[in-house]
């Protein structure tokens, strides 16, 4: 029989009477995890109860935070829109001027800082200048009425072309505005307008109809989106040489007739160029309606050819 000494009993009683905090730590993987676990859990629970609790967020505070976040986001979007609007407005408010001013009237003319057709001036006189215009694409529509510059017909045609430019096309592409707006008189009963795909043909009812066209942004080349409105046609204008006279003020039928007559008369004395047979004039208007009359730039042009050809 095994004998238990009194000293061993005394040591064991002393251990049991000690406080739980003084018990030796026992690793959970050892044989007596239950006793340690009980003391440890109680200690952890007391610590958790002593930790400060986060204050609850009311529904009103949540709504206010959401409104403030949405307002901040809307403000950021508005700032970007205002910045874009300011940049576009600056193109009209701070216009540029042509370098080829030949008289005092032209010196006051200005044009918006927008893309236009590419050309170079071959030479100029005090009455006109000769330009070589590189190929470009236009969107074109027939104008209602028999005059090219009545307010109703011009406004209706302008709006039709603007809708195409700003997204009324097959891919809903919004394109940048260009300048000038070109108006011309139809010369033939049938006029073929070429594009890579498809080939578009337009027929006019008579020779008294006018067409208005927008110069298309050059970055698209022949890959312009097709218009949804069947009255809008895409045309490529080939390279050509033109004689141009510029004038300010408002465009009227009477003013255009007078400018064309003076240009034809002046070209009769040109030693190198002559007006091509059967061509009609074109009118280019560069400025928005709010431009002061003396700052407007308008042009009448006639296609010409070399007399030696």
UniProtKB/Swiss-Prot annotation:
GO terms for molecular function: heme binding. Pfam families: SOUL (PF04832). Signal peptide: none annotated. The keyword Transit peptide applies. Disulfide bonds: none annotated. It comes from the Eukaryota. Keywords: Chloroplast, Plastid, Transit peptide. It is found in: Plastid, Chloroplast, Plastoglobule. One of its GO terms (cellular component) is chloroplast thylakoid membrane. The keyword Kinase does not apply. Coiled coil: none annotated. Residues 1-70 form a transit peptide. PANTHER family: HEME-BINDING PROTEIN-RELATED, OS02G0533200 PROTEIN. Belongs to the HEBP family. This is Heme-binding-like protein At3g10130, chloroplastic. It comes from Arabidopsis thaliana.
